[in-house]
C-alpha cells in the first residue's frame, strides 16, 4: 500500500488531527480548518481509501481505519508534539467516517487524546448495527443499501476540473456547500490523467465498500464508550439523515464526559455546509477545556 502523508496546514501547538468523511478529501475542509491555524498544529489525515494501490475488499470493517490512524498519530506526536501520559496530547476531530475512526482510536488508546470532537459519526442504533453484522457474510448489504448502486455507477472521468465542478454544482447533495468549499472538494478529488482530463482520486469501489461495511463494528463502540474518559463533543446536523436524536443521546449518556450539540440549518455535511459556524462551536469547546 502506498500511504499518503497527512496534509499539514500549520506548525503551531498543540496538535489537532482531523479525519475526513467517506469520499471527501482533506482539502474540502480548508474553510472549516482555517480558523484553527493560528492556535494549533493542524494535520488532516488521508484515510486508506485515498491511498494508491489499496484494495477495498481487504477491509472487513471500519476498525481497519482505526488501525491505520493510530500509528500515523503516534508518528506525528514523535515528530511534532509532546505526549503527557496523564492528559493526552492530541485534539482529535473527525467528520462522519473520520469521526468513527477517531472515536475507535480513542477507545483503543484512551490516553492519547486531550479531547474529541465528533461531527456526525455514523453510529447506528444497536439493532441496526446487529442486523448489518448478521447480513454481512451473505453480501446482502450491497444489494439493499440505498447508496451503493448509485455510487458504483458514478462518473469517474471529466474533461477538466471546471467540468467536474460544474457537474457537481447542480447536484442536490452539494446544494448546501459554498462555491469555495465545492471547489476545494474538486481540487482534492481530481487527479490529472494521461488523456488530458481528470479522474477521481477516490474510487467508487472504495466509497461503496465503506457503505457496505458500515455498522459492522458498531457493537465494539457501544460496548466501549465508557473507556473514552476525555471530554467529547458530538455534533449532529439538524436535518441529518444519519445521526438520530436517540443515538446521540445514548452516546452522550455513556461517555464519561460527553456533550451533544445540534447545528441548525445543516444536514450530514455539517463542517462543509456551515464551516465557519461549526469551527466557532468547536473552538469554543476546545477553549473550555484547554484554557
Residue ranges of model-derived segments:
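Conserved HGGG/HGGXW glycine-rich cap/lid loop of the alpha/beta-hydrolase fold
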Residues: 8-58, 72
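Active-site loop/oxyanion-hole signature of alpha/beta-hydrolase fold enzymes
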Residues: 43, 47-93, 134-135, 280
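Conserved hydrolase catalytic core segment
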Residues: 89-131
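Conserved alpha/beta-hydrolase catalytic His-Asp/Glu region
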Residues: 152-209
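Catalytic histidine-centered segment of alpha/beta-hydrolase-like enzymes
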Residues: 266-275
Amino acid at each position: 500500500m502506498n500511504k499518503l502523508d497527512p496534509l499539514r496546514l500549520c506548525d503551531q501547538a498543540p496538535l489537532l488531527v482531523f479525519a475526513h468523511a467517506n469520499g471527501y478529501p482533506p482539502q474540502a475542509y480548508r474553510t472549516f480548518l482555517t480558523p484553527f491555524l493560528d492556535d494549533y498544529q493542524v494535520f488532516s489525515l488521508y484515510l486508506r481509501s485515498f491511498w494508491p494501490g489499496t484494495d477495498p475488499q481487504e477491509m472487513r470493517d471500519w476498525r481497519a481505519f482505526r488501525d491505520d490512524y493510530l500509528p500515523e498519530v503516534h508518528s506525528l506526536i514523535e515528530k511534532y508534539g509532546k505526549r503527557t501520559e496523564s492528559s493526552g496530547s492530541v485534539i482529535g476531530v473527525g467528520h462522519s467516517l473520520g469521526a468513527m475512526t477517531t472515536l475507535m482510536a480513542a477507545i483503543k488508546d484512551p490516553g492519547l487524546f486531550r479531547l474529541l470532537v465528533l461531527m456526525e459519526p455514523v453510529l447506528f442504533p444497536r439493532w441496526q448495527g446487529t442486523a448489518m453484522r448478521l447480513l454481512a457474510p451473505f453480501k446482502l448489504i450491497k444489494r439493499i443499501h440505498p447508496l451503493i448502486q448509485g455510487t458504483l455507477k458514478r462518473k469517474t472521468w471529466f474533461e477538466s476540473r471546471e467540468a467536474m465542478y460544474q457537474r457537481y454544482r447542480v447536484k442536490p447533495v452539494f446544494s448546501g456547500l459554498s462555491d469555495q468549499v465545492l471547489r476545494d472538494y474538486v481540487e482534492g478529488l481530481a487527479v490529472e490523467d494521461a488523456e488530458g482530463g481528470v479522474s477521481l482520486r477516490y474510487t467508487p469501489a472504495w466509497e461503496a465498500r465503506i457503505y457496505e461495511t458500515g455498522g459492522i463494528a458498531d457493537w465494539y463502540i457501544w460496548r466501549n464508550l465508557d473507556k473514552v474518559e476525555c471530554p467529547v463533543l458530538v455534533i449532529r446536523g439538524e436535518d441529518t439523515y444519519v445521526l438520530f436524536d436517540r443515538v446521540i443521546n445514548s452516546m452522550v449518556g455513556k461517555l464519561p464526559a460527553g456533550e451533544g450539540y445540534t447545528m441548525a440549518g445543516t444536514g450530514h455535511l455539517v463542517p462543509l455546509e456551515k464551516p465557519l459556524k461549526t469551527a466557532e462551536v468547536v473552538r469554543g469547546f476546545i477553549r473550555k477545556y484547554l484554557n
